[in-house]
Amino acid sequence: MLIKTLENLVTEGRNKNTLQIDKEDTLGIIELINNEDKTVAYAVEEQKESIAKAVNIIVDRMKQGGRLFYIGAGTSGRIGILDATECPPTYGVDFELVQAIIAGGNQAIFKAIEGAEDDKELGKQDIIDRGVTSKDVICGIAASGRTPYVIGAMEYAKELGCAVLSITMNPNSEMSKKADLPINIIVGAEVIMGSTRMKSGTAQKMVCNMLTTASMVKMGKVYSNLMVDVKTSNEKLVERAKRIIMIATNVKYDVAEKFLEEADNSVKLAIFMIKSGLDKDSAKSILDRQEGYISEALKSIEKL
């Protein structure tokens, strides 16, 4: 029976620290929530080696033309969407490189779609509809580790030959067993029993942040700690781009503006042009040979 399964889930347990939360004043409630949230980063730290291995898998697949797909239901699906949608503007990657699939489709972003998470075949079909191939990475996300929709997607992804990851919050879950590499973050019982949008959701977001950020660093999208492939898609990002160039090269605003324009709004190219003293075409050629890594491109011209 499902009730027996739920009773055995850590995330469905009662938190002894918050049994009196309904009797607290407003500040007391906030303190209880904050105290529980403080434990999440330490729980994530316990899985840092698994997260690092996952990043290496993602980068390897991306360099072979693969993509990363998050798949989840409810809060877990929305966490994947949050992470995936921020990659293109932050790192200048194609919208297809990191994608998110949520049970029930886009309407489920704003409104719960009853029964969608219980349908294994729907998970499989959504993978098919996205055109997932053996080059891709599928990362199933679910606090419980037992969501049928996600399991259906993971099982089919394994049949295709995808690398399959999981992010869960309960030990020895079915999803962990299905994954090539499970990431199991034990955050414990929630502040409000079963409300996995809280500590579980926070942990999921932290892990997703790490997966994509570390992957983008290793893909040459970052120079020092600067987002050098940022897309200049609005006024704020144009000004950020100029500021990044100024910080990376110690030039004045007008110089940064000039080189950004010359580099066709490529922050990375503008920085390398300034640092190398090369014209646009020569700088671009060297950057391309070094797969977009500014540091490696600079090393290569030092050897000339």
From Swiss-Prot:
Keyword annotations of the record: Carbohydrate metabolism, Lyase
Superkingdom per UniProt: Bacteria
Enzyme Commission identifier(s): 4.2.1.126
Catalytic activities: N-acetyl-D-muramate 6-phosphate + H2O = N-acetyl-D-glucosamine 6-phosphate + (R)-lactate
Gene name for this UniProt entry: murQ
Record Pfam families: GKRP_SIS_N
HAMAP family xrefs: MurQ (MF_00068)
UniProt cross-references to Gene3D superfamilies, sorted A to Z: 1.10.8.1080, Glucose-6-phosphate isomerase like protein, domain 1
Domain SIS: 58-221
GO biological process: amino sugar catabolic process; N-acetylmuramic acid catabolic process; peptidoglycan turnover
Record text on subunit structure and interactions: Homodimer.
Coiled-coil zones: none
Note: A lyase-type mechanism (elimination/hydration) is suggested for the cleavage of the lactyl ether bond of MurNAc 6-phosphate, with the formation of an alpha,beta-unsaturated aldehyde intermediate with (E)-stereochemistry, followed by the syn addition of water to give product.
Active site residues per record: E86, E117
Biological pathway: Amino-sugar metabolism; N-acetylmuramate degradation
Entry GO MF terms: carbohydrate derivative binding; carbon-oxygen lyase activity; ether hydrolase activity
PROSITE patterns attached to this UniProt entry: GCKR, SIS
Membrane spanning residue stretches: none
Membership in a protein family: Belongs to the GCKR-like family. MurNAc-6-P etherase subfamily.
Enzyme class: lyase
This protein's record includes keyword Transferase: no
Keyword Membrane: no
Source species: Clostridioides difficile (strain 630) (Peptoclostridium difficile)
Function description: Specifically catalyzes the cleavage of the D-lactyl ether substituent of MurNAc 6-phosphate, producing GlcNAc 6-phosphate and D-lactate.
Protein's recorded name: N-acetylmuramic acid 6-phosphate etherase
